[in-house]
Design a protein with these regions (language model features):
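Short hydrophobic beta-strand element within catalytic cores of glycosyltransferases
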Residues: 175-178
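Short alpha-helical donor nucleotide-sugar binding micro-motif in glycosyltransferases
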Residues: 18, 137-138, 145-150
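Glycosyltransferase donor-sugar binding loop
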Residues: 51, 82, 105-120, 134
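Nucleotide-activated donor-binding/catalytic signature segment of Leloir-type glycosyltransferases, i.e.
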Residues: 118-141
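Aromatic "clamp/platform" in nucleotide-sugar-dependent glycosyltransferases that forms part
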Residues: 158
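Membrane-proximal helix-turn-helix segments that form the acceptor-binding/catalytic region
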Residues: 5-23
Length: 201
């Protein structure tokens, strides 16, 4: 009951905040449609955050730095993902797929929110398959090298307002596999990514 009451108060506060603006800018038509459901009295525009594609054109030097740091051989098949380690991002699905493919290396770049990890995430972190590496938060040349070296960027998130890491992976010319969720409709299709309808969870 408390959580329902809090959610109602939070929504009222959001509506007040949004209506205090002159205009509202949100990154995708999907997130725009969510805001429109709040019955706001302001103009709402969908404008992507975008990424600087020149920054996501991995060089051989960046790829070599990444492979050397994490001991990735030329023969290794590598699947990566990037984001906070929690269920909404699909971390549990990523772990499950890694467990089912022991011959492939999996890496998830990102930190767990230690202040409030769910019991499910705590359990997953204690029982990780041996082929799954969690480097934590990584930036700069190393993450760019990861985007360049990986065979697949697998991002099974259940909900996004855009998905900046998806833009980064696409800019890096990665083979992208996504859970088919509404936010991607209209700008991601089979020409640039695999949209999975049968991802468990």
């Amino acid at each position: 009951m408390f959580s329902n009451t809090f959610a109602g108060l939070y929504k009222k506060w959001l509506v007040y905040l949004y209506n205090s603006a002159d205009v509202i800018i949100t990154p995708t038509p999907y997130s725009k449609s969510l805001l429109e459901s709040y019955d706001l009295n302001k103009e709402i525009y969908a404008i992507s955050n975008g990424v600087d594609v020149a920054q996501f054109n991995p060089t051989s030097k960046q790829i070599n730095e990444f492979t050397q740091q994490f001991h990735i051989s030329e023969e290794d098949k590598l699947v990566i993902s990037v984001g906070w380690l929690f269920e909404r991002k699909g971390f549990d699905t990523f772990v499950e797929v890694a467990r089912e493919m022991p011959h492939v290396k999996f890496m998830w770049f990102g930190d767990v929110r230690l202040s409030n990890p769910t019991s499910k995430i705590k359990k997953l972190l204690k029982e990780l398959p041996k082929n799954l590496i969690l480097p934590g938060y990584v930036s700069g040349d190393i993450i760019k090298g990861a985007y360049g070296r990986a065979d697949v960027f697998f991002f099974p998130s259940r909900e996004e307002t855009e998905g900046i890491v998806v833009l980064e992976a696409l800019a890096s010319h990665q083979h992208v596999v996504l859970r088919d969720i509404p936010v991607y409709h209209g700008w991601v299709d089979s020409s640039c990514a695999e949209l999975a309808h049968d991802v468990s969870g």
